[in-house]
Amino acid sequence: LDGLLILVSANQIFDITQKLIPVNIPIFIEKPAGLVPEETKILVKLADKNGSKNMVGYNRRYYSIFHKGIELINQNGGLLGVAVEGHERFWKIVDRDIPNEIRENWIYANSTHTIDLLRLFGGEVEQINALKNSLKEKNGDQFVASMKFVSGTIGTYTSHWFSPGGWTVTLYSDTIAVQFKPLEKGIWIDTDFQQHDIM
């Protein structure tokens, strides 16, 4: 075998991956690698111990539109800030037949798609301040974080699961802003507030 794909429900990924890492065949793991951070840490240690190559499927970071947006920002003074809105439409989720374990850990099961974009655009996080609140969900359903990246860029993350909204990313330089809303569509805004499509 050249590689394995682990494409199972979020609450099964950890157990299956833990059994397959020692086989030492490269593994593509559908996100999340673990349904809670402790599970992910265990898998990292196991992979390091076995020297196995693994990749977690955060496909959105490979959208070509994002890389065009990064290029525009770099051509216009460089990245000063990144703002990610990762609102979930949780009122639609609660009526679906989703195991409680996944629902209670939705921030890891699904929201990490948008959280991952912070590191795609900003790089390694140097400092972070985070708050959470709970309207209905025991592990939180309202999240806000402000951070500074090693590069000096600052960033914010906001997510309100029971408020209408979608996923949005905005990048800031000192002369333009680039916005992805929805994530698959990009525009850039100049200092005259003119909007230009990113092709």
Regions found by a protein language model. Name each.
Residues 23-25, 50-53, 153:
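A short helix->loop->beta-strand "cap" motif at the edges of active sites that frequently abuts
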Residues 135, 153-199:
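NAD(P)-dinucleotide binding in Rossmann-like oxidoreductases
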Residues 42-60, 78-83:
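Rossmann-fold dehydrogenase core element
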Residues 12-13, 91, 164:
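Short glycine-rich, flexible loops that bind phosphorylated cofactors or substrates
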Residues 29-30, 54-56, 180:
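Hydrophobic residues in well-ordered beta-strands that form the structural core
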Residues 60-129:
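Predominantly a Rossmann-like dinucleotide-binding segment in NAD(P)-dependent oxidoreductases
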Residues 138-143, 149:
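A short, glycine/Asx- and small/polar-enriched loop/turn
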Residues 1-46:
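Beta-loop-alpha module in the N-terminal Rossmann-like domain of NAD(P)-dependent dehydrogenases
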